[in-house]
Swiss-Prot record:
GO terms for molecular function: GTP binding; GTPase activity; translation initiation factor activity. This is Translation initiation factor IF-2. Belongs to the TRAFAC class translation factor GTPase superfamily. Classic translation factor GTPase family. IF-2 subfamily. The keyword Metal-binding does not apply. Residues 471-478 are annotated as: G1. PANTHER family: TR-TYPE G DOMAIN-CONTAINING PROTEIN, TRANSLATION INITIATION FACTOR IF-2-RELATED.
C-alpha cells in the first residue's frame, strides 16, 4: 500500500485537516502540514490512540466468517468466495454493559464540528444503541454465540455487513438494515470504476472495526460508546492481507486488461481476414452477407477494459465471448479447416460436424481459441550422445541450426551445420540456449549385446587354463615353449626374437594347457598387455645369468594389473654364471616373494636347452589352475578375444581367436569390434582345418569383413542383421571420435607451432604382416621424435605394399617401411619411376636404427668453438684517424687473419669480435705463428691496454646424432 498525505487521508475520513493534525500530534505522530506524507505505521499509531481513547477490549468469542460477493456482469451472475477470517465478538454480558454505558454517557461537543456531521453521528449512535438494547433483551434467551452473531452486524463496518453470508435468526431491525446495506453495496462495483487509492485505503479502516466512526472519529454530538477493537497483531495481519489482496487485484486487472487488448487485436485481424474472404466470395457468387457477429466482441472489449473484474468473472466473460465467436463462424458456414482443425485435434476434441461443401463446421470448446500463441519459452530435455552433429542438436532442441552455429561461434568455435561436436561442448550449447542437457548414449544398438548375454544361461564345465609366457627379451621364453611343444619355433623367428603372439595348446598327462607366447622387446608393450588380459596364469621367465631386466619388471606390472597369479621359471641354470638365489632376491624387491620364503609365488629352476625340471613347471601350472577352479559354459554361443589379426593376400582377413566361453563352430556369425562375418574356415595352430573349438582353445578364423583390432572382444550372434547394424554403428562412432581427435590435434599443433620455427618432419608409411607388429613399430618410431625432427606416421596397416601406399608416399614425400611384407610388381615399378624409397625389414631393431640415422641427418649441425692460439699485447700505438694498434707476441698456436678473438683482461672477457688487420713489419699477412711478433687491430673496438691477452678461435660445425 502506497503512502498518502495528511490532506488526502483527511479527505477520505471527511474530517478537517487541522483536526486530523491535532489527533496525530496527540497520538505521537509529528506532522506539521497537510502535505506531509502519512505512512502505514503512522496510521496504525493513530488507530491505537483512538482505540485507547474511546474504549478497551473486552471478552471476545471467536467465530469463522466467510465473505461472498455476488455481482452481475452483462446479465451473468458471478459469485466469488473469499478466504475465511476469524473475527472476535464480545460476549452478551459485556455487550449489555456497553449499551448501558452508551445510554448514560455522552461525549462533549466540539465547536469546530458542523451541524450536519453532528446530526449524522447522533442518528448512527441512536441506531447502535437501539440495536445493542435489543441484543441485551435477547441475550438471556439465546446462546452467547448466537447473541453475538445478531448483535455484531449492526456494530460492524458497512463492508463487513456486505460480506456476511450467514443469515440472522431473528428478523430484527439491525438485520434488516444490514440487508439493505448489503444490497446497496452489491450495486456499487458496477456503478463505480476501480479507484486504486480508495480501494487500498478503505479496507484498512473498515477492518479496524470502527465503521463510519473511522471516517469521523470522536464527533461532538455522538456519545462516546466503547467500541470492541482488535489487537495490534491482528490489525497488522489484516493490513498485510489487505495489501496482498490489493496487489493481487491490481495484478489480475492488469493481466485481464492485457488479455482483453490482445483478444481485441486478434478479433480485429480475424474480422479483417473474414471480410477479405467474404469480399472474394461475393465477387464469385454476387451475394453479400453481413459480418455483424464478428463485430460484437470488438465492441464489447472497450467497455470491459475499465472494469475491475475478478478472475472468475473474467473467465466466464471470456467464455461467453468465445461462444459468440464460435456462433459467428458457424453462421457463416466456413472455417472448419486449417489451423483450427489441427489445434482442435491436438487438444483431444473431435466434435466436428461434417456436411456438404458449405456445411463443414468445427465446434470449438467455449474456453478454446482457434489459434494458440505460445506464451512462454518451451524448455526441452535434450539427450546428448558422445558425438552429435550441429544439425541433429538443433533438431533435438527444436531450433534452427543457425542458432546453434551462432552459439558455437560465440564460444570461439567455427563450425558448419554438418560438423560433429563432442558431448561436453553440446551440453554447454544446450544450457546456453535455455534447455536442459543430459548425457546419454542415444540409439546404441550395443545394448542388445547385454540383453542377449543375460538371456543365455548354460552349465559351466571345467576348462583348460590359459598360460601366458612373459619375460625380458632373450631370456628363453620361446625356447621353453619349444621344448614343451617339441618344435623349433625359435628358428622361424627373424633374429631369434619373437615378434608375434603365438597361441598353442599342449596335451599333457594331467590335461590340456593353452600357451600364449608374448614378445619381450620393449616395443611390444601393447602385445604383452593383451596377453595378460586374456590369460589365467603367467609364467615369468627370468634368465639366471642375466637377472631382473626392464621388461621383466613391466611383465610383473601387467600380471598384477590383470590380477593373474604368477609362476616364476628361472631359466638357463645350466650356465656357469647362473645364480638362482640372486634372481629370488631381486624379484623379492619387486614384491614377488618365493613360497619357500613365506610368499605365494612358486619358483622353478629350469633349463629350456636341456629340458631340466620342465615337468615340475607344468605341475606347478596345473596346481595353480586347480586352485583357480576354472570353468566356462560349453553349450552356448561362443565368446572370445582377438589375440592377433592380419591380412592375408589369398585368404583375406585372418584373426587368431582365443575362445573363452561357449563353443565356436564353422558357419557362426561372429562380431569382433567393427568387423563381422560368417566363419568360412577354422584352422588350429598346426594348420589343420577344424569345425569347432571349445573354451581355452586358440584358432585362426577366416571370413571377417575387415581386419579386427587385436584385443577386441568377439562374440557369436544369431542375427546377421543385428551384427551388421552394431558393426556399422561402431564404425561411425569410431570415425566421429577419430575426427574430433584429429581436429583437436590440429588446433593444438597450430598453437604449439605459433611463433616458433616449424620442426622438420620425417614422414613414414608402415605396412606389416600382423597388427601387433605395425603397432609396436609405429610406437617405437614416434618415441624417436624430438623438438627439431618429428616422425610422422602417415599410415600403418596390415598386408602387402600396394599402389595406393606408393601414391600416398608420392603425395606426402614419405618413405615406406615393409615389415615382413613385400610390394607387388606394379607397386615396385611405380615406386622406381617416382623415386619413392621402400625399405624392407624383418627385425624391429634394424628399422628403428635406420629411421634414427635418417633423423640424425635431418638435424641442423651444431656449432663449436676451436681455440687456435693466444696473443699477448705488449705495446699500444695510437694513430690519428686510424685508432689503436696493438703490438703483440704470439704466445701459443697461430693467429689467422679471419679468426675470431676475445679480449681478456685480468682473466675476464672484455670483448668478443674479429680482427680488422694483421701485419708483420708493415706487410699484411694471413697468419702469424707462435714466437713471432705482429701488429693487429680489432674491428670496431679501441679500448685495448698493455698486458691484455687475445684468444683466437674458429667456429666449426659438428654433425649431431640422436
Amino acid at each position: 500500500m502506497s503512502n498518502t498525505t495528511v490532506e488526502q487521508f483527511a479527505a477520505e475520513l471527511k474530517r478537517p485537516v487541522e483536526d486530523l493534525l491535532k489527533q496525530l500530534k496527540e497520538a505521537g505522530v509529528s506532522k506539521n502540514s497537510g502535505s506531509d506524507s502519512l505512512t502505514l505505521d503512522d496510521k496504525q499509531l493513530l488507530n491505537a490512540y483512538l482505540t485507547k481513547k474511546n474504549g478497551s477490549n473486552g471478552g471476545t468469542i471467536s467465530i469463522r466468517r466467510t465473505k461472498t460477493e455476488v455481482s452481475t456482469v452483462d446479465g451473468v451472475k458471478v459469485e466469488t468466495r473469499k478466504r475465511g477470517r476469524t473475527v472476535n465478538i464480545p460476549s452478551a454480558e459485556e455487550l449489555a454493559a456497553q449499551v448501558k454505558a452508551a445510554q448514560t454517557q455522552a461525549a462533549p461537543v466540539r465547536p469546530e464540528q458542523t451541524a450536519e456531521d453532528a446530526a449524522k453521528a447522533r442518528a448512527e449512535a441512536a441506531a447502535r444503541a437501539e440495536a445493542r438494547a435489543k441484543a441485551e433483551a435477547e441475550a438471556a434467551k439465546l446462546k452467547a454465540a448466537k447473541a453475538g452473531n445478531k448483535a455484531k452486524p449492526a456494530a460492524q463496518k458497512p463492508t463487513e455487513a456486505k460480506a456476511e453470508t450467514a443469515p440472522v435468526a431473528a428478523e430484527t431491525k439491525p438485520a434488516e438494515e444490514s440487508k439493505a446495506e448489503k444490497a446497496q453495496a452489491d450495486k456499487m462495483p458496477s456503478k463505480k470504476p476501480a479507484e486504486p487509492k480508495e480501494k487500498a485505503a478503505k479496507p484498512k479502516h473498515e477492518r479496524n472495526g470502527k465503521g463510519k466512526d473511522a471516517k469521523k472519529p470522536a464527533k461532538p454530538a455522538a456519545p462516546a460508546v466503547p467500541q470492541p477493537v482488535v489487537s495490534a497483531e491482528e490489525q497488522a495481519q489484516r493490513d498485510e492481507e489487505a495489501r496482498r489482496a490489493a496487489a493481487l487485484r491490481a495484478h489480475q486487472e492488469a493481466l485481464l486488461k492485457e488479455k482483453q487488448e490482445r483478444q481485441a487485436r486478434r478479433e480485429a485481424m480475424k474480422q479483417q481476414a473474414e471480410q477479405q474472404a467474404k469480399a472474394a466470395q461475393e465477387a464469385k457468387t454476387g451475394r453479400q452477407r453481413p459480418a455483424k457477429p464478428a463485430e460484437k466482441p470488438q465492441a464489447a472489449a472497450p467497455a470491459l477494459e475499465n472494469k475491475p473484474v475478478n478472475p472468475a468473472k473474467a473467465k466466464k466473460e471470456n467464455r461467453r465471448n468465445r461462444d459468440d465467436e464460435g456462433q459467428g463462424r458457424n453462421a457463416k458456414g466456413k472455417g472448419g479447416k486449417g489451423g483450427r482443425d489441427r489445434n482442435n485435434a491436438r487438444n483431444g476434441d473431435d466434435e466436428r460436424v461434417r456436411g456438404g461443401k458449405k456445411g463443414k463446421k468445427l465446434k470449438l470448446e467455449p474456453n478454446q481459441h482457434a489459434f494458440q500463441a505460445p506464451t512462454e519459452p518451451v524448455v526441452h530435455e535434450v539427450l546428448v550422445p558422445e558425438t552429435i552433429t550441429v544439425a541433429d542438436l538443433a533438431h533435438k532442441m527444436a531450433v534452427k541450426g543457425v542458432e546453434v552455429v551462432k552459439a558455437l561461434m560465440k564460444m570461439g568455435m567455427m563450425v558448419t551445420i554438418n560438423q560433429s561436436i563432442d558431448q561436453d561442448t553440446a551440453l554447454i550449447v544446450v544450457e546456453e540456449l535455455g534447455h536442459i542437457g543430459k548425457p546419454a548414449a542415444a540409439d546404441d544398438p550395443e545394448a542388445f549385446l547385454d540383453e542377449g548375454a543375460e538371456a543365455v544361461e548354460a552349465e559351466a564345465l571345467p576348462r583348460p587354463p590359459v598360460v601366458t609366457v612373459m619375460g625380458h627379451v632373450d631370456h628363453g621364453k620361446t625356447s621353453l615353449l619349444d621344448y614343451i611343444r617339441r618344435t623349433k619355433v625359435v628358428q622361424g623367428e627373424a633374429g631369434g626374437i619373437t615378434q608375434h603372439i603365438g597361441a598353442y595348446h599342449v596335451e599333457t598327462p594331467r590335461g590340456v594347457i593353452t600357451f600364449l607366447d608374448t614378445p619381450g622387446h620393449e616395443a611390444f608393450t601393447a602385445m604383452r598387455a593383451r596377453g595378460a588380459k586374456a590369460t589365467d596364469i603367467v609364467i615369468l621367465v627370468v634368465a639366471a645369468d642375466d637377472g631382473v631386466m626392464p621388461q621383466t619388471i613391466e611383465a610383473i606390472a601387467h600380471a598384477k594389473a590383470a590380477g593373474v597369479p604368477m609362476v616364476v621359471a628361472v631359466n638357463k641354470i645350466d650356465k656357469e654364471a647362473a645364480n638362482p638365489e640372486r634372481i629370488r632376491q631381486e624379484l623379492t624387491a619387486h614384491e614377488v616373494v618365493p613360497d619357500e620364503w613365506g610368499g605365494d609365488v612358486q619358483f622353478i629352476d629350469v633349463s629350456a636347452k636341456k629340458g631340466l625340471n620342465i615337468d615340475a613347471l607344468l605341475e606347478a601350472v596345473l596346481l595353480e589352475a586347480e586352485v583357480l577352479e576354472l570353468t566356462a559354459p560349453v553349450d552356448a554361443p561362443a565368446k572370445g578375444i582377438i589375440v592377433e589379426a592380419r591380412l592375408d593376400k589369398g585368404r583375406g582377413a585372418v584373426a587368431t581367436l582365443l575362445v573363452q566361453s561357449g563353443t565356436l563352430k564353422k558357419g557362426d556369425m561372429l562380431l569382433a569390434g567393427t568387423a563381422f562375418g560368417k566363419i568360412r574356415a577354422m584352422v588350429d595352430e598346426n594348420g589343420k582345418s577344424i569345425t569347432e573349438a571349445s573354451p581355452s582353445i586358440p584358432v585362426e578364423i577366416l571370413g571377417l569383413s575387415d581386419v579386427p583390432n587385436a584385443g577386441e572382444d568377439a562374440m557369436v550372434l544369431a542375427d546377421e542383421k543385428k551384427a551388421r547394424e552394431i558393426a556399422l554403428f561402431r564404425q561411425g562412432k569410431y570415425r566421429d571420435v577419430r575426427l574430433a581427435k584429429q581436429q583437436a590435434a590440429k588446433l593444438e599443433n597450430m598453437f604449439n607451432n605459433m611463433g616458433e620455427n616449424q620442426a622438420q618432419s620425417l614422414s613414414v608409411i608402415i605396412k606389416a604382416d600382423v597388427q601387433g607388429s605395425y603397432e609396436a613399430l609405429a610406437g617405437s618410431l614416434k618415441k624417436l621424435s624430438t623438438d627439431e625432427v618429428k616422425v610422422n606416421v602417415l599410415h600403418s596397416g596390415v598386408g602387402g605394399i600396394t599402389e595406393s601406399d606408393v601414391n600416398l608416399a608420392i603425395a606426402s614425400g614419405a618413405f615406406i617401411i615393409g615389415f615382413n611384407v613385400r610390394a607387388d610388381a606394379s607397386s615396385r615399378k611405380l615406386a622406381e619411376n617416382e623415386n619413392v624409397e621402400i625399405r624392407y625389414y624383418n627385425i624391429i631393431y634394424d628399422a628403428i636404427d635406420d629411421v634414427k640415422a635418417a633423423m640424425s641427418g635431418m638435424l641442423s649441425p651444431e656449432e663449436k668453438e676451436q681455440v687456435t692460439g693466444t696473443v699477448e699485447i705488449r705495446q699500444v700505438i695510437s694513430v690519428s684517424k686510424v685508432g689503436n694498434i696493438a703490438g703483440c707476441m704470439v704466445t701459443d698456436g697461430v693467429v689467422k687473419r679471419d679468426s675470431h678473438v676475445r679480449l681478456i683482461r685480468n682473466n675476464v672477457v672484455i670483448h668478443t669480435g674479429e680482427l680488422a688487420s694483421l701485419k708483420r713489419y708493415k706487410d699484411d699477412v694471413k697468419e702469424v705463428r707462435m714466437g713471432f711478433e705482429c701488429g693487429l687491430m680489432l674491428k670496431g673496438y679501441n679500448e685495448i691496454m698493455e698486458g691484455d691477452q687475445l684468444e683466437c678461435f674458429d667456429i666449426v660445425e659438428v654433425a649431431r646424432t640422436l
